[in-house]
A protein has these predicted regions:
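Hydrophobic adenine-recognition pocket in adenosine-nucleotide-binding enzymes
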Residues: 122
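A short glycine-rich, Lys/Arg-flanked "PGG" loop and its adjoining helix->strand segment in the class I
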Residues: 131-142
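Conserved beta-strand signature within the Rossmann-like core of class I S-adenosyl-L-methionine
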Residues: 143-151
Length: 198
């Protein structure tokens, strides 16, 4: 009981959720197949070279990106060790293990400059999403693309208790986004957006 505290976010996603989060993500992907398919189409239109999938969950987008001929390597980053093991196993079984590496955090990816960043349904779970945008910007190559979405809303009935929605945090996020990135039009009617590093 009580509020989800920003200082607890890392431990929550790394330790507390266990395999339950993996199963919940898999079920959500199955029930949202049309939406997931559209985000995969958008990713296929936009990514190339070195791709970061940040907070990649069960790895659907990372594995799809790794299968693209335009992609050299996918750097899958997720705090949850169960998600990491699941994605490694899936990459191995799909013959993509050479094009995909699994990491706990962005700092363990070395000094790679990314040509594309994929961060879907993650930013609203971070206690400082503006800082994450700045870190992405710093690690992106000139002209790189970011595929992002977010939902800074706890819900009308509190159905998203692990989303941060403080108005000052959200305002700071949009100010950072607008200062560091330029939105790129795409024709798909989905919440995911494309941005070019400014």
């Amino acid at each position: 009981p009580g509020a989800f505290r920003p200082e607890d976010a890392t431990a929550f996603y790394e330790d507390t959720v266990g395999t339950g989060h993996l199963l919940e993500l898999a079920a959500w992907h199955l029930s949202s197949a049309d939406y997931i398919a559209d985000t995969l189409r958008l990713q296929g239109m936009a990514v190339q070279g070195q791709v970061l999938d940040f907070g990649g969950g069960i790895g659907t987008h990372a594995l799809s990106a790794a299968a693209l001929p335009e992609v050299d390597h996918v750097w899958f980053v997720d705090l949850n060790p169960h998600n990491q093991a699941f994605v490694q196993q899936r990459a191995q079984s799909l013959g993509l293990a050479d094009k995909l590496s699994v990491h706990r955090d962005l700092s363990s990816t070395g000094d790679v400059r990314f040509d594309a960043v994929v961060c879907l349904d993650v930013l609203e779970h971070l206690p400082d999403p503006s800082a994450q945008l700045l870190e992405f910007h710093q690690r992106m190559a000139p002209g790189a693309i970011a595929l992002l979405n977010w939902y800074f809303f706890k819900g009308h009935q509190g159905e998203y208790p692990f989303h941060f929605d403080d108005p000052a945090l959200v305002d700071g996020f949009f100010r950072t986004l607008q200062a560091q990135f330029l939105e790129v039009f795409h024709p798909l009617l989905i919440t995911a957006r494309l941005y070019r590093r400014s």
